[in-house]
């Protein structure tokens, strides 16, 4: 694939991409390098304009747990991994810190309230790995061919990632930044 500074489209594994894009925003903020700012801004525009679900979920494809093509946003077969939603929150938070624009918090909140928290049951004991937008009772979207939240997974990144993310919530509730003009 392209070097990060040449990327304009979100591609590949949605979780890893979300973390990489978060890192790009951090590098842009720390160094002030306009090439990183330009690259991450283009990628963000691609995500929010062409690759994000109404829930804030990202990563349309089960194959590769990946972003799909532009506008490839199926409901029934949507992947929208819980960990990808967490990566989306991280990326938008860092972009908010970089730019100070509330549009990033709009995406963060949409993802948090709809695409991320849907990954855990109300009692906190069962989880979704993928988060499809619809269920017909026939398409078994979980890897074990079920259609319900599960107490655990063979690859248990989502439950542990939620456990890591939830304690960080207070830091997202109130964010103050100083922008010098």
Regions inferred by a protein language model and the residue ranges of each:
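Glycan-recognition and catalytic cores of secretory/periplasmic carbohydrate-active enzymes
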Residues: 1-181
